[in-house]
């Protein structure tokens, strides 16, 4: 898993367009 450099505490991952998913309040890429 690679951190996408984005948090998702208050808003969803904007980087989800790059297949980033929220996990433990941080956006990760599989």
UniProtKB/Swiss-Prot annotation:
Keyword Cell division belongs to the record: no
Keywords: Antiviral protein, Disulfide bond, Knottin, Plant defense
Classification via Pfam families: Cyclotide
Sites of the Cyclopeptide (Lys-Asp) crosslink: 1-30
Signal peptide residues on this chain, from the entry's feature table: none
Cystines in this chain: 4-20, 8-22, 13-27
PROSITE patterns to which the protein is assigned, alphabetical: CYCLOTIDE, CYCLOTIDE_BRACELET
PTM per Swiss-Prot/TrEMBL: This is a cyclic peptide.
InterPro entries named among the record's database cross-references: Cyclotide, Cyclotide_bracelet_CS, Cyclotide_sf
Gene Ontology BP, a term: defense response
Presence of keyword Membrane: no
Comment text on domains: The presence of a 'disulfide through disulfide knot' structurally defines this protein as a knottin.
Function: Probably participates in a plant defense mechanism. Inhibits the cytopathic effects of the human immunodeficiency virus.
Family of this protein: Belongs to the cyclotide family. Bracelet subfamily.
Protein's name according to its UniProt entry: Circulin-D
